[in-house]
């Protein structure tokens, strides 16, 4: 019997993880909690209790709760509970019986075997349970923490529209599966993940300003990550004379000194975010080619004019 429950649990875990996981953000802690602030600890006796509920004949009460670790306080928001049948149907799926987003719900179910799944951001836990004739209380341990991300150039915060973050499980030096678990995370969003090591990839603009960093997430803590980019916003212009009007219908290529193409665009004055360094701008207009070498300094936004002569 235990062997059957074990394999059913494995099958449900595989079935739940087969779908596409998208980033979910949640306010994990109250405002003001920093990465260095531990969540206060309370004994299990302090876990909130449910008010008395009338249980109809043929039903049993299942009381649920979750916490970050043993003896930690209960999680009070952001949870999604699902109760499934313990056996798969003919199609191989586990039938969903009940779903609840309360932090500590009480579900009324007929006696029998079930599988309970709780999700909190990208963290989750699952247990097989058996309901008899008496109320059953189950507390799930979810060793999860939060990531809150932002990007800066010097002391200036990068606008949300110009930066995004991807989160990968494990270190950047590992060679395992490199699919992101959260994509295009915005500044200030809180991403809830299981505790562990993660690789953060920050993209400022769409060219070559990319910063990678490994961080450690601890259960019950919010980790604020500030990614500093050494880059600047450059506006390209093809002009007939210095300070003149930019010529329309110009095709642009930005190259490294070694000739690698960093960015291509078309327009009179395209904006491009470039990492600090030296570059060559090539402008093509009406069948003619013009070029100029230039240098990017961190935080110094400005125009790069290429003379059409």
Where is each model-derived feature located?
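Short, structured motif recognition centered on aromatic/hydrophobic residues
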Residues: 62, 78-84, 114-116, 142, ...
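Short, acidic Ser/Thr/Gly-rich low-complexity loop/linker segments typical of extracellular
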Residues: 86-103, 172-187, 256-268
